[in-house]
Amino acid sequence: MKLSNIKSKEVVRILQKQGFEIKRQSGTHIIMRNNGKIVVVPIHKQIIPIETLKTIEKQSGINFREIIS
């Protein structure tokens, strides 16, 4: 799977495996938290844009490229 073809559900699943918990949903965004880190995942589109995914990587400290390879 290419990094540019990752879906919102997959991002949420990866974050949960890394210890993030869903705290709430605000409209079309899921707010997740782990040890003070807050990550916002948009769920209004099937595939997350690459720039948004880079922001999620920065917020979470997780490298999705390593996990999905």
Spans of features found by a protein language model:
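Basic nucleic-acid-binding interfaces
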Residues: 1-69
